[in-house]
């Protein structure tokens, strides 16, 4: 179930955000709505599949480096990947969220910028970290999101820092040049 060659997905973009936390709040609200709808309108299908729909109250949030520290201190797991979460770490983090918060979901934020796409905004307080997140559920990453760069010069600087040819992204960066609102 980890990698599928075909799947259906849902992407959404939000403009005029203050931070990535606005995107996370919207995602949490959408998940609550979808789960409630499925519970109310699909009981026969749920019974047929022997599936349970999780209860979503609040979704705990943990920073990437804090998550790595907890996995080592609480579970004795020494990570070999300093830029991302391995599958076993995703399972452990979901176990931690269930034990500590009674939640089957957990947001992991502030991944190393080097791991995130060129359009992910870096944290002004620590530019080595991106203002981005993954949402984990029952041991699997189910979404990725974050705040995107909206400033033209900031986007051009990040492309240059990553030694990417800005000309190849001209149609993308043109939007920034003429005015892009804060978005995620």
Feature roles, as predicted:
Residues 1-17, 174-180:
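Class II aminoacyl-tRNA synthetase-like tRNA-binding/catalytic domains
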Residues 23-27, 63, 151:
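Hydrophobic (often cysteine-bearing) scaffold residues that line and stabilize catalytic clefts
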Residues 141-149, 180-184:
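Conserved phosphate/anionic-ligand binding catalytic regions in large, soluble enzymes, centered on
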């Amino acid at each position: 179930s980890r990698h599928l060659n075909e799947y259906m997905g849902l992407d959404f973009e939000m403009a005029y955000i203050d931070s990535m936390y606005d995107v996370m709040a919207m995602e949490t609200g959408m998940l609550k709505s979808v789960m409630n709808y499925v519970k109310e309108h699909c009981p026969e299908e749920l019974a047929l599949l022997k599936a349970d729909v999780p209860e979503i109250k609040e979704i705990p949030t943990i920073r990437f480096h804090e998550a790595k520290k907890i996995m080592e201190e609480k579970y004795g797991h020494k990570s070999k990947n300093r830029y991302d979460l391995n599958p076993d770490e995703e399972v452990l983090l979901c176990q931690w969220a269930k034990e500590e918060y009674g939640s089957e979901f957990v947001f992991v934020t502030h991944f190393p910028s080097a791991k995130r796409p060129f359009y992910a905004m870096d944290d002004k307080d620590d530019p080595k970290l991106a203002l981005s997140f993954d949402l984990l559920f029952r041991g699997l990453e189910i979404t990725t999101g974050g705040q995107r760069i909206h400033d033209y010069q900031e986007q051009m600087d990040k492309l240059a820092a990553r030694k990417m040819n800005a000309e190849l992204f001209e149609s993308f960066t043109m939007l920034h040049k003429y005015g892009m609102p804060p978005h995620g």
